[in-house]
Amino acid sequence: MASTTANPPLPPLTHILETCIYVRDIAASAKFYQETLGIAPFFESPRVTGFSLGVTTLLLFELGQTNSDVHTPTGTIPHHGPSPRVLASLQDKTDGHGEEEQSLKQHFCLAVQSPEQVEQWEGHLQAKGVKLLSRMGWERGGKSVYFEDLDGHVVEIASRGVWPHY
């Protein structure tokens, strides 16, 4: 006879708490994000720098510093990041043929409320000399601007009207 006891529903997931990107020079990248976005780190170490953005967190990890588990008295943070072969390619300044250095080109998006605020950020980024990659107008009325950080990551600033839920 089958059990009639139902499992309770799982608690809902509410948001992504952490977004992490891998950088070649943690100090230079932290300075770029501080000066470009006007955000201050809440945590800094040779391995990771953390920035608070509302209820979410942007983590910058130094390439090669996350390939071992981190053991603490309360648990273990598992290793993550590029495999050793990919890591070696990313840490090499060229591809061996004198071509441009390798990049993960990770992407993440930062939220603002309105298309006008995206335009304000675009002007700010231009004034700072940040490499703008593109602009996008969305069917729902949202707007995005894309720019590149020091490691070639694609950062987006977008307004409401991009997705059905935002």
Question: Whereabouts are the PLM-identified features?
Answer:
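Conserved short beta-strand elements that form part of the metal-binding/catalytic scaffold
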Residues: 41-102, 154-160
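Vicinal oxygen chelate
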Residues: 2-9, 122-166
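Short secondary-structure junctions
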Residues: 38-43, 132-135
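N-terminal beta-strand motif that seeds the catalytic metal site of vicinal oxygen chelate
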Residues: 2-28, 105-110, 161-166
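Amphipathic alpha-helical segments
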Residues: 25-40
